[in-house]
Amino acid sequence: MFLDVVRKHGNGRVAYCYARALLDIVVDSADSICEEIKLVRAALTADGEVRAFFANPVTPKENKIAVLQALGKSCKLSRTLVGFVCVVVKDGKFGLLSDMFEEFFVLLMHARGQFALEITTASPVSAAEEKRILSIVKSEYGEPATVTKRVDPAILGGFIAKADSLVIDASFAGHLRELERVSRSVVCGV
């Protein structure tokens, strides 16, 4: 929930709105659109000249749209996706296209009841430790669609598992913060 709120502020809110609209349009053909999005994202963001062409405010939008339509035909992309990207260009939001696609994938996972999990540990974990952490998460929240592992020595030990509104803080640093909070409330009456 918190990550959703943070994501929706500023340009993130714009990206969210466009992604939501795309998801609403392609709900029945989401799998094929996902593959097309990966292709479009690679084609439009990998090459610096292509990015510069679409980001250049002097280049007429009609020229940009013509290039997109030609790309759509040559790559056999769906009219829906080509139309979506053309609307993004017409609205002057091409710089947010990659964010829109990222939001789309997050929203699609939510619609399917899936979630992305990030596990943070103080040092790299063994396969057995990872399996144990995942079993804790699975027992309470279900199977994560993706798992990202991060190492942060500042947590001192244990782990922190995050996914949208879910946070399991079993880190030593988290326990120390909780101990400090309880101690203050006992000593200070706060």
Swiss-Prot record:
It is a peripheral membrane protein. Pfam families: OSCP. InterPro entries: ATP_synth_OSCP/delta_N_sf (IPR026015), ATPase_OSCP/dsu (IPR000711). The keyword Translocase does not apply. One of its GO terms (molecular function) is proton-transporting ATP synthase activity, rotational mechanism. Coiled coil: none annotated. One of its GO terms (cellular component) is proton-transporting ATP synthase complex. It is found in: Cell inner membrane. The keyword DNA repair does not apply. Gene3D superfamilies: N-terminal domain of the delta subunit of the F1F0-ATP synthase (1.10.520.20). Keywords: ATP synthesis, Cell inner membrane, Cell membrane, CF(1), Hydrogen ion transport, Ion transport, Membrane, Transport. It comes from the Bacteria. F(1)F(0) ATP synthase produces ATP from ADP in the presence of a proton or sodium gradient. F-type ATPases consist of two structural domains, F(1) containing the extramembraneous catalytic core and F(0) containing the membrane proton channel, linked together by a central stalk and a peripheral stalk. During catalysis, ATP synthesis in the catalytic domain of F(1) is coupled via a rotary mechanism of the central stalk subunits to proton translocation. F-type ATPases have 2 components, F(1) - the catalytic core - and F(0) - the membrane proton channel. F(1) has five subunits: alpha(3), beta(3), gamma(1), delta(1), epsilon(1). F(0) has three main subunits: a(1), b(2) and c(10-14). The alpha and beta chains form an alternating ring which encloses part of the gamma chain. F(1) is attached to F(0) by a central stalk formed by the gamma and epsilon chains, while a peripheral stalk is formed by the delta and b chains. Belongs to the ATPase delta chain family. This is ATP synthase subunit delta. It comes from Anaplasma marginale (strain Florida). The lineage of its organism: Bacteria, Pseudomonadati, Pseudomonadota, Alphaproteobacteria, Rickettsiales.
